[in-house]
Amino acid sequence: MVHKKIKVNLKNTSYEVIIGKGVSLDKKIKSKFIYGKEILLISDKNIPEKKINIITSSVEDCGPHKLNSLKLKLNERSKNFTSVSKIHNFLIKKKYTRDSLIICIGGGILSDVSGFAAATYLRGINFMLMPSTLLAQVDASIGGKTGINHTMGKNLIGSFHQPILVLIDITFLRSLSTI
């Protein structure tokens, strides 16, 4: 498969965005980002189970590490501290450390919430994005904007926290409902 790699160069950091059909966690990515890590795989409940199983198996194949999964169903109303606290509570109970990694598989809201949780847990841990919606693939996953809503307005609380990698598999778009 031909994949397009785009390097996002920022003042203090950089990361790759890999785009294509069937983009996955290949050996190079696994050895660089996953091997030996404590990983929390956060996915949207709307992602097809088959897709989650493929990604989970791919992560499990890469050697010793701790892998846990958390499924969330979020919307604009639940893009708040309560949802971030669910992630923080999970990380704390499972004793995740500064070297841990969050892998987020979902749309823009889940990317914002899980990115904000990563930015604020232990003053910042790494996270990787696998956006599953068109808007998340072209907007929410690029630029490091993370955050949540407040009762007084949208996206009022947040942080810039860059992902270590963005994997955009365009086949996710097939699973979206049609209007």
Model-derived segments and spans:
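Short glycine-rich anion-binding loops that position phosphate/pyrophosphate groups of nucleotides
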Residues: 45-47, 107-110, 171-172
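ATP/NTP phosphate-donor binding region
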Residues: 1-101
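Hydrophobic, well-ordered secondary-structure scaffolds
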Residues: 84-90, 107, 119-120, 138
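Phosphate- and divalent-cation-binding pockets in alpha/beta enzyme and binding domains
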Residues: 50-54, 112-113, 137
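A glycine/threonine-rich phosphate-anchoring loop and its flanking beta-alpha core
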Residues: 9, 24, 115-116, 121-179
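A short linear-motif detector with a strong N-terminal bias
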Residues: 18-21, 81-83, 108, 135, ...
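Glycine/serine-rich anion-binding loops at beta->alpha junctions
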Residues: 100-119
